[in-house]
Amino acid sequence: SLRRSISLDFFIYNVLPGTTSAAGVKAHFLKAIILGESTVDEISSDFAFELLMHMKGGTSIDVLLDLALGDDEAITGQAAEVLKTQVFLYEADMDRLKLAYESGSAIAKGILESYASAEFFTKIPDIEENIEVVTYIAGEGDISTDLLSPGNQAHSRSDRELHGKTL
């Protein structure tokens, strides 16, 4: 139905990642799908892992660690591969990996070795040599240092000359 489609699109594309309460609900629901505790025809276990990967940290890391350090070997391996792509881990997450490693977990060892080798960076796919930007639209006041900088208030910045030269 249309409502189901809209709901799925919202869940997949519009729930903010990170540490928001909504992200927590999304991550735990995806975990339930992966474990077979919940079923959504449009979200397979593989797609649930992909969605967790795109959440890039926060509560998704906790869920991925639960899955990677669990008992189901098919799930642990897949969760470990996703974890190896993530960079936003907290100290508590690393402590969980350390404890699992010290307890003899081969999965934890593999994840830690991957981080030590910076595979989260070295295994990023190559990008094209030349990327053309066809159109970029930003309303007045919406341009910030995070995007193109300087914004319409650049005259008040002490580094405006530097920012002006970068444009």
Predicted features and spans:
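Feature captures the catalytic cores and cofactor-binding loops of soluble hydro-lyases/lyases
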Residues: 155-167
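Structural detector for internal amphipathic alpha-helices that build alpha-solenoid repeat scaffolds
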Residues: 2-21, 43-56, 66, 76-88, ...
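Short, surface-exposed loop/turn motifs that are enriched in glycine and acidic residues
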Residues: 37-38, 50
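Short inter-helical turns and helix N-cap capping residues of alpha-solenoid HEAT/ARM repeat scaffolds
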Residues: 40-41, 71-72, 104-105
